[in-house]
Amino acid sequence: MGRDNLIERLKREAEEQYRIFNQKFVLTNRNVMLGVKVPKMRSIAREIAAGDWEGFLAGYGFGVGNAVQMAEIAEQLNRDERCRTIFFEEVMIIGMVIDLINVPPSVRLALVEQFVPLIDNWAVCDVFCGGAKWVGEPGRGPKACNRVPLEQVWEFLQRYLFPDVEECHPQVESSGTGHRREYGGENPQGCSEFEIRFGVVMLMSYFLVPEYIGKVFEVLARVRKGDYYVDMAVAWCLATARAKFDAQTQAFVAGAGLPAGVLKKYEQKVRDSLIMRKRGSSR
């Protein structure tokens, strides 16, 4: 599916009232929103992932193929410049396709690395992270064998969790480059706010397990805070951890010296979670 065909289809699926409603909650300064609901975007993404997904991603400047090579920095920036003009729904579908395709771990992580700079809002971030079912230990079956092990994903995420720390940007097999990327302010809210959120939401989605919970707390204590969408992600992650590791989470929060704003958001999310549980148990 080429871009022109995709846009034509998205416009057919768009709902003006939904666009007006959604724009109140999803702030994206880079991309215009058409108003297509997520289930319809997922349906389109599945069609693309089952067909010529390489041609689709290449049309947006992604380096794809059997041996994925990251674009040079200048080419990467040119791609990001082009992608400033695409619709919000296009970015969503690009992320969904990357989540859905069945590719080796090195190819997957190289595509993710190229995708993350396009994230400039919580919706794209959270939908992409929630759909990353490729995270996990390899298992049986043609798709399970291409999962990316937790340890490999953990190391990969460090560059996003700590974008200002040089040692968190190692040369890795997945990207084929040792360059630390400089985005020149492509993200209107700051080039690292949504990179950090991406890292935190990935931790929340896949690393709240006994083997990693201690390391997750260490990261949440160190990660740079102060940006609204980072603080919200940290609070969300802690509230989710509270439901799984109650005593450990409470002990961490009590001694971590978290900013007052993060604590307030965390406490609100815990209260909201308790309310929802009570409602569910009363049905």
What is each of the regions a protein language model found here?
Residues 1-167, 173, 179-283:
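Alpha-helical scaffold domains
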